[in-house]
């Protein structure tokens, strides 16, 4: 099954839709999908769409929606991970990828007293998140928070009045 990420996905059964040029090219040229092949789409907010390709065009691949599932694989709890960025950005990218694949709901980066890295390329992290979401066939994209101070992060977490587990490595 091939999953495509479309953040503005608000389709219903029986409707037609077209992928953007980048996703269409990937669908037809790279994955070599053809008409009548089944694909899945998600908006990253729980909507999961099963569709059949109706027009395999490199510039605008069209499909017909067969089934729509809202709140697909929704859980009744939330996993929020806060981490200080490491000096090696590859490790942070790997962490984000694995967190998305595992189904983390929220990722926060914080700066501590001895943090080695204070700059995070948000656009790069978001691309990695989209890639991991598609690879793991998840329907929920984690919320990526802005960088915060460690003490502010803990203070805000205590205001939520929920069970919190802290793990320091």
What are these regions (language model features)?
Residues 1-71, 123:
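N-terminal positively charged helical leader segments and presequences
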Residues 72-167:
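RNA substrate-binding interface of SAM-dependent RNA methyltransferases
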């Amino acid at each position: 099954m091939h999953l495509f990420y479309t953040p503005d996905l608000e389709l219903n059964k029986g409707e037609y839709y077209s992928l953007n040029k980048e996703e269409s090219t990937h669908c037809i040229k790279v994955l070599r999908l053809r008409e009548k092949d089944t694909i899945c789409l998600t908006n990253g907010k729980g909507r999961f769409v099963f569709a059949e390709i109706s027009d395999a065009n490199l510039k605008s691949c069209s499909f017909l929606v067969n089934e729509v599932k809202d709140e697909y694989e929704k859980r009744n709890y939330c996993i929020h991970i806060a981490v200080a960025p490491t000096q090696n950005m590859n490790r942070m990218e790997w962490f984000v990828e694995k967190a998305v694949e595992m189904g983390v709901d929220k990722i926060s980066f914080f700066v501590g007293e001895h943090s080695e890295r204070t700059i995070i390329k948000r656009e790069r992290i978001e691309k990695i998140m989209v890639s991991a979401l598609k690879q793991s066939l998840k329907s929920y994209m984690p919320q990526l928070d802005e960088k915060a101070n460690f003490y502010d992060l803990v203070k805000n977490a205590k205001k939520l009045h929920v069970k919190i587990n802290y793990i320091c490595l």
